Amino acid sequence: MRFRKDGVGKITPILVATPSDKVRNGPYVWPKGPYKHIQADKGRPETMMWSYVRKNGGRGFGFTGGHKHLNWGNDNFRKAVLNGLVWIAKAKVPKNGIKSSVSVEELKQNLDPKGKRK
């Protein structure tokens, strides 16, 4: 991720990791890479979850990890996102975070039917 550097607010990284060279080489993007500007950043940590505070006090929260639906079954995954939502609402985030639970059956409810992969 690239963020503005012109002082319009403050980005605070929450979740940062360094993608493998395999990821940088492009099979996980659409349209499929590789892309030179992505490969040029090999070894560079990437921010995947962040908070943002505007100069006027407004808050934002971003996360690039919502692509795999079953990840929502992970308690810590949900907790991080729920904590971010509570924080942007300027409510108090509990010391141990927002607790929630979801079953596999609940995760599978109301999913759109998928066609065959080509």
Language-model segment annotations:
Residues 66, 89-92:
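Cell-envelope and extracellular/periplasmic
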Residues 35-39, 66-75:
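Active-site rim elements
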